[in-house]
């Protein structure tokens, strides 16, 4: 048996192992298409600023071709470094495209004020054809997307500080698009706006230079459909991270935006580890989880073997991403989602409408959190040097704060999970209903006895008083038994509950309501 378990462990390890580079053949190259990337041919700020202005207008052209749009975006993304050409040549290794760098310089003979640098021949006509477009015939107005503020016609500046701020503003909006462009492009607008507000408040960007929605939609769609552009952006992020010492301000901003980009599309895997394993609840000892725990272990080892590209596997369309799908560990994922919903309010809006979602294990995760609330892990307590008295004190405080939190919490979290029931709970619900009926009968007897004793004690009253009113206790006129304000508050709440219960018992429709039935499929969507 020991050898079988050892062989099983080796099998799981080799099964999820990525293929090694071997054989006599080299890298497989596809049919490449040429991407023209204009770069500044001198160190003048005017040249860079004028080039940025032309590129922004090119991207906003609705009729721009895909390869030309990719080249313009690569040029914009690399304008913040001192030598954009060297950067592009160093980090670009794409089997699908061939990048052709073209230097641009200032010129007074072209419409754009720029021309392609050459040693002899004039390239003014070629520069005009590249940077400008023909106006449509018939007097039709071309719709171009630039900035939300239509008063901004150009962004050409002369000083380096102003250029860096404008460039940082444009780059921030482009990099923010990468976070959701691949996974959820249709619902990305809200999160992108929150990121923009954050950097505006931090004075990293200029709020007046907010790009138009149509411009952003064009770039988002291009990022989603062009793998080569995403490869360049990921390579640029990794190159910035490897740079030692202090980095330029724009580079630091890109690294900050990268925190929203990494692990995009890997939420199921990351959340399963966070809520299912790191919480270390005893439910992990179930036999049902044994196989999936070994699967998660193999995936974690595979994630580490992939190195620095692992967090970007979905963005880079790596085929190995399918191994990390929640369908490979459905029971553990369902359990982890139940734990997460109870621990974090932000998990309440998560969509659980998956074919492999298991409500029973989801509820198992919920119950583990609820029943383990306030308990201290003995292993962790021993590592931290926590005594038994301190652990008991922590448990009491945690239980009190948990009750206070539950009393204030309302809404989505409980409404999403209260319907999750299994067929095994039928007997429990039946026993609970019997207990409820017995409790109702007992309360009715006590209420009847109380109302009967009140009749002997009350004075003659000409007004007709209903029996339900006689059983109600006036909290305001009840004499105080002690001077403890907390005790008085609890007593008042208890009396109010008794009043509400008495009113319910007098309701003739009591007991006629049929239990409400929920449709799991409808509520999960």
From Swiss-Prot:
Keywords: Capsid protein, Helical capsid protein, Host cytoplasm, Ribonucleoprotein, RNA-binding, Viral nucleoprotein, Virion. Residues 477-505 are annotated as: Interaction with the phosphoprotein. GO terms for cellular component: helical viral capsid; host cell cytoplasm; ribonucleoprotein complex; viral nucleocapsid. The keyword Translocase does not apply. Residues 1-403 are annotated as: Ncore. RNA binds at residues 180, 195, 202, 260, 351. Its main location: virion. Residues 1-36, 373-391 are annotated as: Homomultimerization. It comes from the Viruses. The keyword Glycoprotein does not apply. Residues 1-375 are annotated as: RNA packaging and organization of the helical nucleocapsid. Residues 404-525 are annotated as: Ntail. InterPro entries: Paramyx_ncap. It is found in: Virion; Host cytoplasm. One of its GO terms (molecular function) is RNA binding. Belongs to the paramyxoviruses nucleocapsid family. Ncore is globular and carries regions required for N self-assembly and RNA-binding. Ntail is an intrinsically disordered monomeric domain in the C-terminus. Forms the helical nucleocapsid (NC) in a ratio of 1 N per 6 ribonucleotides, protecting the genome from nucleases. The nucleocapsid (NC) has a helical structure with either 12.35 or 11.64 N per turn, approximately 20 nm in diameter, with a hollow central cavity approximately 5 nm in diameter. The encapsidated genomic RNA serves as template for transcription and replication; encapsidation by N is coupled to RNA synthesis. Forms the encapsidation complex with the phosphoprotein protein P. Before encapsidation, the newly synthesized free N protein, so-called N0, is chaperoned by P. Homomultimer; forms the nucleocapsid. Binds to viral genomic RNA. N0 interacts (via Ncore) with the phosphoprotein (via N-terminus); this interaction allows P to chaperon N0 to avoid N polymerization before encapsidation. Interacts as N-RNA template with the phosphoprotein (via C-terminus); this interaction positions the polymerase on the template. Interacts with the phosphoprotein; this interaction leads to the formation of membraneless organelles that function as viral replication factories. This is Nucleoprotein. The gene is N.
